[in-house]
UniProtKB/Swiss-Prot annotation:
Membrane topology label: Single-pass type II membrane protein
InterPro entries found in the cross-reference section: Antenna_a/b, Antenna_beta_CS, Antenna_beta_dom_sf, LHB-1/5, Light-harvesting_complex
Family: Belongs to the antenna complex beta subunit family.
Cytoplasmic membrane side: 1-22
Bilayer-crossing regions: 23-45
Subcellular location field: Cell inner membrane
Gene Ontology cellular component list: plasma membrane; plasma membrane light-harvesting complex
Protein name: Light-harvesting protein B-880 beta chain
Length: 56
């Protein structure tokens, strides 16, 4: 059995954890970029903070 291998809380090896972290961070950054673009487009369409004249 693999008794000599250090076991982490997640059960992943160091390499597996690093690989998962890389994929996770890349996916997260893509998600954040899409969210930022969506917010910019929504703001251009209908701003949600009124100007001095209110929602005119």
């Amino acid at each position: 059995a693999e008794i000599d291998r250090p076991v982490s809380l997640s059960g992943l090896t160091e390499g597996e954890a690093r690989e998962f972290h890389g994929v996770f961070m890349t996916s997260f950054m893509v998600f954040i970029a899409v969210a930022i673009v969506a917010h910019i487009l929504a703001w251009m369409w209908r701003p949600w903070i009124p100007g001095p004249e209110g929602y005119a």
